[in-house]
From Swiss-Prot:
Keywords recorded for this protein, A-Z: Chloroplast, DNA-directed RNA polymerase, Nucleotidyltransferase, Plastid, Transcription, Transferase
CDD domains listed in its UniProt record: RNA_pol_B_RPB2
InterPro entries in UniProt: DNA-dir_RNA_pol_bsu_ext_1_sf, DNA-dir_RNA_pol_su2, DNA-dir_RNAP_su2_dom, DNA-dir_RNAP_su2_hyb_sf, RNA_pol_bsu_bac, RNA_pol_bsu_CS, RNA_pol_bsu_protrusion, RNA_pol_Rpb2_2
Gene3D superfamilies xref list: 2.40.50.100, 2.40.50.150, 3.90.1100.10, DNA-directed RNA polymerase, beta subunit, external 1 domain, DNA-directed RNA polymerase, subunit 2, domain 6, RNA polymerase alpha subunit dimerisation domain, RNA polymerase Rpb2, domain 2
Pfam families on file: RNA_pol_Rpb2_1, RNA_pol_Rpb2_2, RNA_pol_Rpb2_3, RNA_pol_Rpb2_6, RNA_pol_Rpb2_7
Transferase is among the record's keywords: yes
Annotated localization: Plastid, Chloroplast
Protein name in the entry: DNA-directed RNA polymerase subunit beta
Record-listed E.C. numbers: 2.7.7.6
Family per similarity comment: Belongs to the RNA polymerase beta chain family.
């Protein structure tokens, strides 16, 4: 069995490839810079560049809000020539700072962890397709995609004439393009396989009779120039530069794909589109037109490439060098103009490179803030694959075939783990064994079955290559050698499923989880779940909150250990030695005569406000080995991932409190801190140096609001703060208006010219819902380029302890999610035959319709494991061993638990897995036996404390005069269509009228209503229409429709027209 590669390995390999190869490649492209008079030459030495070790550590960069980066030094030479002498000066100069990847596979920019995710793009090369035109006739096209995404289309019509389109503009003859590229008619006809098809264009000799005419025609179409341009050498050079060199650059990957598709032998370093490529592409298009070739599947992974962190960082480095070149040219010109002596150091500085990476990490769509909700989230985020981003697709234009699962995804992209919503299928996740190959392709490992050697050899295959082999399905892994010779096994061949003899098998899978992502691989019994529910579970595991008392799962899959190890949450011994000292802050390890200090994470805030904390697990004097675990991190126990709790669950309805995914829980989960979690919130205030003042003397504020401030006006560590308390006292000076001057102030200003200032209270106050304990206060200085713009910010970190409560969201590992609806006293909960009350009650109707039966297997096996004190690690698709293997395993464990505990009710043959339980309120047994078990239940980050919101007054929409929408905008309630139906159903006409009209969007009436409610008067009835109705009338008028209403008399039925 092969070992699973590190989950962060793709990020590490990409960054190392950028450092080892990408920097050298881009520096080799840096040109030799000369002035117009050739007096000064400036160039870089490719052989000599170095990255120095970062000046700060990762922890300090996060704490002080700095960028964890390394300085890049390059050797440069300057040659200065004048009439008599020649000066040569060589220096090692600093050209900028490059952010360095941390041990988490992420970058630290301004104290924030950021990750660069991988992007899937269409690979450069040529692709042949067939589409139906408006007349229902098949049109065959060959599309040449350049390295940057530009397109050149070859199209063959019914008369077998070949046309060319540039960026989907008007088509022109292929002979015009070839002539503009430098070929004459004779060379064209001699180098194609079907010259007779090209002769049909020769009637128009005026356009293609000469190279000049072809260049003019092509330039007119390409540049969209009106009129008749005149040929010149500059026009020809402009066309060569803008089109044939910039827009038609294939790159190394594109050149390789063109050679393989068209059977060419053009050197790999020739990365531009050549006339030979166009001729070969036209020949292949003619063959496909007449049925002598195959079309390309654009969604096949062999036609895609991965744009990794190495490619993105190298691209930004090349952009920075272009800016550096322009700076050097400008400084050389300034040196000659102002007659000052240049040196390599003063020709360039570090600003272009540093600013380029600063903008990239802040604004680029593929640079995202690392999600650190729990350890699993960190490693999954770095393994994402995105079709979105620059050069990629958009969520609005991506079609269903692009989002759908493709057979080439097998073992490379997880078919389950993807986003929900508009980005479904566009953001995927790497399979756990996949890796990125040399040419940007996704490779998957297989075992090659050889007759010569008894053992199997592992090899990585790129997409498309495995289709030429007979690949055995995963169930063949369980067959021993004796049975294999007689068995027929299912296999894959050319995207089809076959049944073949074992002797015909050439490759087989290496691991049961090979085609799943990390999130899907952590779901036990995943084969018994619907794929939609498995997708939800993969996403919800990343939303689990680390609990204060973590507990590892009874039923797992075996990947929990490596997930915890690769997440960086654990403290690992890098050397063997002896523990010299340990406390909650650090561990001192002595070995080889040195003492190594290992700092531990102490109540660190993640960007999702969860608490990251490490607990030492070694004692003083203990000898440890390299790789041993020294401290557990958040959501880890025993070196394994521990996201939730094993709780006793009954699947039964209970008084309607678990209707529609609601969950009923016991108060034991609250009082014993089973689902208690810690959350850290950050509150920040900026202080301008000079005028603003931090102080604890704030006038006009009550004393109890300032009770936690120290003498400097900042809240003290360890203080317990409530809503409205002052965290930082700040006064901002403001000038008094002329009209508010007192007479004596006006006299002083007139005589002495003095201005009177007052101070405005701009303190940092604790908002609603922020109560907790202050655990840290930081002063952070952010310096701008201008010395006068230096600002300071004070950050206050407050720790909150949150028990589980009504409104919180919980979920299992099978897509079974729900909201806490009621917390019952433990004596009222249903209890088992041994007297134990259950902890949660789930609705059984949520299982059959959603087809996630895996939760039943996990629940029953978890109960058996709890009684037998065992933990199970089960690989998926265990039916490959025998039929009903999962059911047999669960029932056998329940039966054994029943025997060992002498409790026959645990396994009753009449209803295996079910048991008679009793109503805690009456003591009577329920009518039917109920499934009970111990599944692994997670508490998710969607908590009611973050969702609940109230508003008394606030801002209104300028257009509709209704309250704004959303908690972030401090919005209010908006009565929608379904709310109106609910009120109509109860016949509350007056409440409905008030909520829809003068309490909502009637500007004048809502002020009167407020006054009458305060003083206890009768609510007035407004005479005119509310603002939303007036807006509706105005919109109708913009469509030239006038809205009026009429009164019909009962006596005369005459229409008395009255204006609206």
């Amino acid at each position: 069995m092969s070992t699973i590669p590190g989950f962060n390995q793709i990020q590490f390999e990409g960054f190392c490839r950028f450092i080892d190869q990408g920097l050298a490649e881009e520096l080799s492209k840096f040109p030799k810079i000369e002035d117009t008079n050739q007096e000064i030459d400036f160039e870089f030495f490719l052989e000599r560049y170095q990255l120095v070790e970062p000046l700060i550590k990762e922890r300090d960069a996060v704490y002080e809000s700095l960028t964890y980066s390394s300085e890049l030094y390059v050797s440069a030479r300057l040659i200065w020539k004048n009439d008599r002498r020649r000066y040569i000066q060589e220096q090692t100069i600093l050209i900028g700072k490059i952010p360095i990847m941390t041990s988490l596979g992420a970058f630290i920019v301004n104290g924030i962890y950021r990750i660069v995710i991988n992007q899937i793009l269409q690979s450069p090369g040529i692709y042949y397709q067939s589409e139906l035109n408006d007349n229902g006739i098949s049109v065959y096209t060959g599309t040449i995609i350049s390295d940057w995404g530009g397109r050149l289309e070859l199209e063959i019509d019914r008369k077998a004439r070949i046309w060319v389109r540039v960026s989907r503009q008007q088509k022109l003859s292929i002979l015009v393009l070839l002539s503009a590229m430098g070929l004459n008619i004779r060379e064209i006809l001699e180098n194609v396989c079907y010259p007779e098809l090209f002769l049909s264009f020769l009637n128009d000799k005026k356009k293609i009779g000469s190279k000049e005419n072809a260049i003019l025609e092509f330039y007119q179409q390409f540049a969209c120039v009106e009129g008749d341009p005149v040929f010149s050498e500059s026009l020809s050079k402009d066309l060569q530069k803008k089109f044939f060199q910039q827009r038609c650059e294939l790159g190394g990957i594109g050149r390789r794909n063109m050679n393989r598709r068209l059977n060419l032998d053009i050197p790999q370093n020739n990365t531009f589109l050549l006339p030979r490529d166009i001729l070969a592409a036209a020949d292949r298009l003619i063959r496909i037109k007449f049925g002598m070739g195959t079309l390309d599947d654009m969604n096949h992974l062999q036609n895609k490439r991965i744009r990794s962190v190495a490619d993105l960082l190298q691209e930004q480095f090349g952009l920075a060098l272009v800016r550096l070149e322009n700076m050097a040219r400008g400084n050389i010109y300034a040196a000659l103009k102002h007659n000052w002596t240049p040196t390599p150091q003063n020709l360039v500085n570090s600003t272009p490179l540093t600013d380029t990476y600063k903008v990239f990490f802040r604004l680029h769509p593929l640079s995202q803030v690392l999600d650190r909700t729990n350890p699993l989230t960190q490693i999954v985020h770095g393994r994402k694959l995105s079709y979105l981003g620059p050069g990629g697709l958009t969520a609005r234009t991506a079609t269903f075939p692009i989002r759908d699962i493709h057979p080439s995804h097998y073992g490379r992209i997880c078919p389950i783990d993807t986003s929900e919503g508009i980005n479904v299928g566009l953001i995927g996740s790497l399979a756990i064994h996949a890796r990125i190959g040399r040419w940007g392709s996704l490779e998957s490992p297989f075992y090659q079955i050889s007759e010569r050697s008894k053992g199997a050899q592992m090899l990585y295959l790129s997409p498309g290559r495995d289709e030429y082999y007979m690949v055995a399905a995963g169930n063949s892994l369980a067959l021993n050698q004796g049975i294999q010779e007689e068995q027929v096994v299912p296999a894959r061949y050319r995207q089809e499923f076959l049944t073949i003899a074992w002797e015909q098998v050439q490759l087989r899978s290496i691991f049961a989880f090979q085609y799943f992502s990390i999130g899907a691989s952590l779901i036990p019994f995943i084969e018994h779940n619907d794929a939609n529910r498995a997708l939800m579970s993969s996403n919800m595991q990343r939303q689990a909150v680390p609990l204060s008392q973590s507990e590892k799962c009874i039923v797992g899959t075996g990947l929990e250990g490596q997930a915890a190890l690769d997440s960086g949450a654990l403290a690992i011994a890098e050397h063997e030695g002896k523990i010299f000292y340990t406390d909650t802050d650090k561990i001192l390890l002595s070995g080889n005569g040195d003492t190594l200090r290992i700092p531990l994470v102490m109540y660190q805030r993640s960007n999702k406000n969860t608490c990251m904390h490490q607990k030492p697990q070694v004692r003083r004097g203990k000898c440890i080995k390299k790789g041993q675990i020294l401290a557990y991190g958040a959501a880890t126990v025993g070196g394994e991932l521990a996201l939730g709790k094993n709780v006793l669950v009954a699947y039964m309805p209970w008084e309607g409190y678990n209707f529609e995914d609601a969950v009923l829980i016991s108060e034991r989960l609250v009082y014993e801190d089973i689902y208690t979690s810690f959350h850290i919130r950050k509150y920040e205030i900026q202080i301008n140096q000079g005028p603003e003042r931090v102080t604890n003397e704030i006038p006009h504020l009550e004393v109890h609001l300032l009770r936690n401030l120290d003498k400097n006006g900042i809240v003290m560590l360890g203080s317990w703060v409530e809503t409205g308390d002052i965290l930082v006292g700040k006064l901002t000076p403001q000038m008094v208006k002329e009209s508010s001057y007192a007479p004596e102030d006006r006299l002083l200003r007139t005589i002495l010219g003095m201005r009177v200032y007052t101070s405005k209270e701009t303190c940092l106050k604790l908002p609603i819902g922020g109560r907790g304990r202050v655990i840290d206060v930081r002063w952070v200085q952010s310096s701008k380029t201008d010395e006068t713009e230096k600002t300071e910010s004070i950050r206050v970190y407050i720790l909150q302890k949150r028990e589980i409560k009504v409104g919180d969201k919980v979920a299992g590992r099978h897509g079974n999610k729900g909201i806490i609806s009621k917390i019952l006293p433990r004596q009222d909960m249903p209890y088992l035959q041994d007297g134990r009350p259950v902890d949660m009650v789930f609705n059984p109707l949520g299982v059959p319709s959603r087809m996630n039966v895996g939760q039943i297997f996990e629940s029953s096996l978890g109960l058996a494991g709890d009684l037998l004190d065992r933990h199970y690690r089960i690989a998926p698709f265990d039916e490959r061993y025998e039929q009903e293997a999962s059911r047999k395993l669960v029932f056998s464990e329940l039966y054994e638990a029943s025997k060992q505990t002498a409790n026959p009710w645990i396994f009753e043959p009449e209803s295996p897995g079910k048991s008679r339980i009793f109503d805690g309120r009456t003591g009577d047994p329920f009518e039917q036996p109920v499934i009970i078990g111990k599944p692994y239940i997670l508490k998710l980050i969607h908590q009611v404390d973050d969702k609940i919101h109230g508003r008394s007054s606030g801002r209104y929409s300028r257009l509709t005069q209704q309250p704004l929408k959303g908690r972030a905008k401090k919005g209010g309630q908006r009565v929608g269509e379904m709310e109106v139906w609910a009120l109509e159903g109860f016949g509350v006409a007056y409440i409905l009228q008030e909520m829809l009209t003068y309490k909502s969007d009637h500007i004048r009436a809502r002020q009167e209503v407020l006054g009458t409610i305060i003083f206890g008067g009768r609510i007035p009835t407004p005479e005119d229409a509310p603002e939303s109705f007036r807006l509706f009338v105005r919109e109708l008028r913009s469509l030239a429709l006038e809205l009026n209403h009429f009164l019909v008399s009962e006596k005369t039925f005459q229409l008395n027209r009255k204006e609206a």
